[in-house]
Every structure is written in C-alpha cells, then in structure tokens.
A protein has these predicted regions:
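Conserved alpha/beta catalytic core and glycan-binding cleft of carbohydrate-active enzymes
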Residues: 1-113, 117, 128, 163-165, ...
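Short amphipathic alpha-helical patches
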Residues: 125-126, 141, 175-182
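Residues that flank catalytic or metal-binding motifs in active/ligand-binding sites
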Residues: 58-59, 133, 151
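Non-catalytic scaffold segments within catalytic domains of secreted glycoside hydrolases
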Residues: 77-86, 133-134, 141-145
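Core nucleic-acid recognition elements
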Residues: 120
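Aromatic- and acidic-residue-enriched segments that line the glycan-binding/catalytic groove
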Residues: 123-133
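Catalytic cores of secreted or luminal carbohydrate-active enzymes
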Residues: 138-172
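Catalytic cores of eukaryotic secretory-pathway lumenal/extracellular enzymes that build
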Residues: 1, 135-138
Length: 182
C-alpha cells in the first residue's frame, strides 16, 4: 500500500552514522563510505535498491527522531567538537548539511522538534524516562541558533517549490543524478 510509510534508517545512518555506535561518523562528519547511501536515500531508496519502499510516499526521510540521540548530540558525540550545550561552528555546519540532505531528498521529510535550532538532550539516547530538564526545548536556542533556523526555513521553501522533491511517486526517479551518475 503506497499510503503506508517506513522510517528510512539507511539514510539516517548515512547522514550521521549508526545510532548504535556513538562514535561512528556519517557523511556529514566526513565518512565517505556513506556517499552511496546518500545517493540512494535522496531517491527514497526506491526501485532497484533492495528496500521496502516502492515509491517516495513510503519513505520517511530523517536524521533524528525521539529515539536515540538528537542530530546535534550525535554530531558532538562522534566528533568531540564541543560540549553538548556549547555552540560549535563546525557542528552547526554539519547540522545544516544534514538538513540539506533531508530536504533535498524524495520522500516524506521528518525532523525532530528543535533540530532546526541544534537541540540537545545532553547525550541522553533514551530520554523517555529522563527529567524535563533533559527533554525540554531550550527556547534560548531561538536566539543562539537563529541563523540555523533561517537556513532550515529556506530549505523547506526550496523543497516545497521543487516538484521532483515533493512528488510521492517515481515520476522523477530517473532525473536524479550525482556528479553525472545515477
């Protein structure tokens, strides 16, 4: 049924590294072994790529959700760029790159609340039972990460205005190329 979608763990891992290995880097942290995973994920892992989705409507494209580390936490943990509650310009660039990959991909775009403002749960990967202090959204980040929020708004506008990215069928599949290859 094309109306039932799956969370695409393949692109999640390609973007930021495995959620089960805290120090593993994904493509945004410089791990080039995940380049093909980004290419497949951008096309919602459909058609020839041995995944469950037959069309973009069945693929939820994401980098983080309520399970496991936030995107910013995974970047910090795998790179040691800063403490969780510190702004790292390199980590911000990686967060922006992840946002670009999600929004430049076919499928249903999903983002964890606060991803656009580099939300942290201070490395807690199983926070359902953690304190409100860990789980709350730090509203000061609206100011501290205003540039990232603006960037994400732009990404969303681009995606909304570009039909090949919002199409939920395989009409545009063959139009995706990466450096001249598919």
């Amino acid at each position: 049924n094309s109306r039932i979608a799956f969370f695409n763990d393949s692109i999640r891992n390609a973007i930021k590294g495995s959620v089960f290995e805290s120090d593993e880097k994904g493509f945004v942290q410089g791990n080039e072994k995940y380049a093909s995973g980004i290419r497949y994920g951008a096309r919602a892992n459909t058609k020839k790529y041995n995944w469950l989705a037959q069309a973009p409507s069945q693929c939820v494209t994401y980098a983080a959700c309520h399970d496991n580390a936030t995107l910013y936490d995974k970047i910090i943990c795998s790179t040691d760029l800063a403490n969780y509650d510190e702004r790292s310009e390199d980590a911000v660039k990686m967060n922006k790159m992840a946002g670009a990959m999600i929004n430049a991909s076919q499928g249903i775009t999903f983002m964890l609340a606060g991803e656009e403002m580099c939300r942290t749960k201070y490395g807690d990967t199983n926070s359902y039972k953690s304190s409100p202090e860990i789980n709350k959204i730090k509203w000061q980040n609206l100011v501290d990460y205003a540039d990232v929020i603006s960037y994400y708004k732009g990404l969303i506008q681009i995606k909304k205005s570009f039909t090949p990215l919002t199409s939920m069928d395989n009409t545009y599949f063959d139009n995706f190329t990466f450096g001249g290859s598919r």
